[in-house]
Amino acid sequence: MYDPEKISFVDVLRWFWEAHDPTSGMGQGNDRGTQYRSGFYYFDDEQKQLIEASKKAYEEQLGRPITTEIAAASDYDQYGGLWYYAEPYHQQYLSKPGARPYCSAQPQGVSLAPFESWAPEGLKEKHAPKLSENFWKKHAPKRGCSVVQEPNEPIPDSDM
């Protein structure tokens, strides 16, 4: 869930690509299986265009194929078309102190190219990033495990 008043869909995309290894196939780290695969599900054609364009740009920067599943949310009916929140103990799982001895997400330390360089025509102004480069310098995922071992606190509005 995100607040489009504070961040744009392309900010969410940037965080998504940079916060994990999207080339790891059916898993993350030592966790293997379809339930651990990377996936991004869209709700309209504009989101699909933005996801596909950002994927292509990030794939070029990584220099290897991205294996993230991209599909319409409405087509994802493995569970009867229903979406569920994770169990309470899985909410913010990696940010819980001592919850994991390792970070399975494995951020690659590669930043997504500037939006202007990959934005689909006609969508640049409507979906411009809202988060500043100062935000990304301070809060972007770092290579390896960037999960904090302290309570997960909201990012202050002053950092946005």
Name these PLM-found stretches.
Residues 1-160:
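Flexible coil/turn and secondary-structure edge motifs
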